[in-house]
């Protein structure tokens, strides 16, 4: 929103959500019907028929630019503006497809009102020349002066400030404008197409090719990484005045009063508004920063979960990734798209970099193993997954990372003995492997309501259930279990004086249930009304009861100084991080020398106190009484 929104700021279909595509449906259906039922090829309106396919292609093209741009800026080598992107910008730019819908509606209107457009051929050389000349002349000239006018304080405050709210640009930032401003741009950019229609030189390729050109140049200028090769300007020096670069336009977003041109910098050079640092910035960003200067201090290794999680990561759908997994209203559409994209993941033989964050002087990256939860639970895929994790550990060490955290199922005991396998195979491993058990247990303890005297522990026997049980016993909290195998497994690993707090019971009467993996809906139905389900697992339990309280998986709120966080971690809310991921960051900040994997434990109280001291805060979606002065939580 502009700082002082003017008239016609909101788009007409602002309140329709994704139903706005229904505005195009009648015209698209009628266009297809006319094309199919035409008695001869001469009667087919090619330009009208291509409107809907072009709408779909432009949506796909825009998404590809988002993915490529975010992949490049996560790598950071040719990144231009190295500032933080936030959730506010993601929300502001989520309607980037509005201008594509508006284009489709305008094309349908032109086709219906101008008979010349209904007989457009596939190709017209004259039309291509007319379009190129009119764009380089009137369009670029008028846009330059319009753009300068929009930077007048009255128009800027009411309209153009909405676009300039994004200092760190993404490809789709290019089309984020108030409705009235976008309409003016449409009138301006319609000059070449309407002129070819009026002169009878319009063609399907010319009209749609011009749209592709506009999209390409818009996305290029706002992608925030330099990719235009220097050889183009060496081969044809005048190109410098006909083609802007991402670094050239980025200066307009950081300096505001320079580099006003649309796509051709010639008018900035003519009227003396070229930023003096344009050439220097281009050379510097094209060469790229020394990757050693951006070595990750912490790498968080995660993986995909359900098929729709393909799009719920930073390289996927920006608006979807900025909300918890499963919160998107278009869930069915996501699952359908995932069915197409998921098989392609098998072609990836290594991790990909998804996020790059910063806390204080710590560089933090998130790497994703392109495999789903189903691959981790499959015996046939277990070895392949283990090799991918081992390669990621080697890559992290080669990159100079001090700490690597194993997220989700990457720390499974059957897979790698909670990460210990990689330390055993390489005793000289400099990168510290952290499974985050201590901080996860501390987060669970903090969610247990104050005054609790006994809990019911359910789930599979694993490292975190053992450490959690030990911590509860030290606090003289009775730990009940109904599973004899789990009871015997945990009891034999506790000291005799602690075993008295373990109880094998047939009763499900405890008001606090600590649930891990493997808890069924049938077991949940045995809980009393109002019982608290507190997960200690990586994955949240299925919510089988409406009359009970379900807490989130172990997590913490990140410090305010945590930069460049604009995606949600799986099912967690914004700016909330899983305890396992946070553990690695704390480990690096404290410069602890040692692994936390296998049977090694940092210490529950030690990890919790350090996390709080570093700015992390307890998180519980039901906001039970918080931590006490000694950091022990409600217990």
Curated annotation (Swiss-Prot):
The chain crosses the membrane at residues 46-66, 100-120, 127-147, 183-203. One of its GO terms (biological process) is response to water deprivation. It is a multi-pass membrane protein. Pfam families: CER1-like_C, FA_hydroxylase. Its EC number is 4.1.99.5. The keyword Endoplasmic reticulum applies. One of its GO terms (cellular component) is endoplasmic reticulum membrane. One of its GO terms (molecular function) is aldehyde oxygenase (deformylating) activity. It comes from the Eukaryota. It catalyses: a long-chain fatty aldehyde + 2 NADPH + O2 + H(+) = a long-chain alkane + formate + 2 NADP(+) + H2O. It is found in: Endoplasmic reticulum membrane. Residues 139-273 form the Fatty acid hydroxylase domain. Homodimer. Aldehyde decarbonylase involved in the conversion of aldehydes to alkanes. Core component of a very-long-chain alkane synthesis complex. Belongs to the sterol desaturase family. This is Very-long-chain aldehyde decarbonylase GL1-6. The gene is GL1-6.
């Amino acid at each position: 929103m502009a700082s002082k929104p003017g008239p016609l700021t909101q788009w007409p279909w602002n309140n329709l959500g994704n139903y706005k595509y229904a505005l195009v449906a009648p015209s698209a259906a009628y266009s297809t019907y006319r094309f199919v039922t035409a008695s001869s090829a001469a009667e087919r309106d090619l330009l009208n028929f291509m409107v809907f396919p072009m709408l779909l292609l432009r949506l796909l093209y825009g998404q590809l630019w988002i993915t490529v741009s975010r992949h490049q800026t996560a790598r950071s080598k040719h990144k231009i503006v190295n500032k933080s992107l936030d959730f506010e910008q993601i929300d502001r730019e989520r309607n980037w497809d509005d201008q594509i819908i508006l284009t489709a509606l305008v094309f349908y209107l032109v086709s219906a009102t101008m008979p010349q457009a209904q007989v457009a051929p596939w190709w017209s050389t004259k039309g291509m020349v007319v379009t190129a000349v009119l764009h380089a002349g009137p369009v670029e000239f008028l846009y330059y002066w319009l753009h300068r006018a929009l930077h007048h304080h009255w128009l800027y405050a009411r309209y153009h400030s909405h676009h300039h709210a994004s200092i760190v640009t993404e490809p789709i930032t290019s089309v984020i404008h108030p409705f009235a401003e976008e309409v003016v741009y449409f009138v301006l950019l319609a000059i070449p197409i309407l002129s070819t229609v009026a002169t009878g030189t319009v063609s399907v390729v010319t009209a749609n090719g011009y749209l592709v050109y506009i999209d390409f140049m818009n996305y290029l200028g706002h992608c925030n990484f330099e990719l235009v090769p220097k050889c183009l300007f060496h081969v044809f020096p005048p190109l410098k005045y006909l083609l802007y670069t991402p670094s050239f336009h980025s200066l307009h977003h950081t300096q505001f009063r320079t580099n006003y041109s649309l796509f051709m910098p010639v008018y900035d050079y003519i009227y003396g508004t070229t930023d003096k640092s344009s050439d220097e910035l281009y050379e510097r960003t094209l060469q790229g920063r020394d990757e050693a200067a951006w070595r990750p201090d912490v790498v968080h290794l995660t993986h995909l979960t359900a098929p729709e999680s393909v799009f719920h990561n930073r390289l996927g759908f920006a608006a979807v990734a900025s909300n918890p997994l499963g919160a998107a209203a278009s869930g069915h559409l996501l699952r359908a798209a995932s069915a197409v994209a998921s098989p392609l993941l098998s072609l990836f033989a290594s991790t990909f970099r998804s996020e790059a964050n910063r806390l204080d002087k710590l560089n933090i990256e998130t790497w994703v193993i392109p495999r789903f939860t189903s691959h981790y639970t499959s015996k046939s895929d277990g070895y392949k997954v283990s090799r991918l994790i081992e390669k990621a550990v080697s890559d992290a060490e080669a990159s100079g990372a001090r700490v690597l955290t194993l997220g989700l199922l990457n720390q499974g005991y059957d897979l790698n003995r909670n990460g210990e396998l990689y330390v055993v195979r390489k005793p000289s491993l400099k990168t510290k492997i952290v499974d985050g058990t201590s901080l996860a247990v501390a987060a669970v303890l903090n969610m247990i309501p104050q005054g609790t005297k006994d809990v019911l522990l359910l789930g599979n026997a694993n490292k975190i259930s053992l450490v959690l049980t030990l911590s509860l016993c030290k606090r003289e909290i009775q730990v009940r279990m109904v599973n004899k195998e789990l009871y015997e497994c945990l009891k034999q690993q506790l000291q005799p004086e602690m075993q008295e707090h373990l109880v094998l019971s047939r009763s499900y009467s405890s008001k606090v249930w600590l649930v891990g993996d493997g808890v069924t809906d049938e077991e949940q139905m045995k809980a009393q009304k109002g019982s608290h389900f507190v997960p200690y697992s990586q994955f949240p339990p299925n919510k089988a009861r409406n009359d009970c309280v379900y807490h989130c998986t172990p997590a913490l709120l990140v410090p305010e100084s945590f930069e460049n966080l604009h995606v949600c971690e799986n099912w967690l809310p914004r700016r909330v991080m899983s305890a396992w991921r946070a553990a690695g960051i704390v480990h690096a900040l404290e410069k602890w020398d040692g692994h936390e994997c296998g049977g090694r434990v940092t210490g529950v109280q030690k990890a919790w106190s350090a996390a709080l001291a570093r700015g992390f805060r307890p998180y519980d979606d039901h906001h039970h009484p918080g931590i006490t002065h000694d950091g022990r939580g409600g217990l």
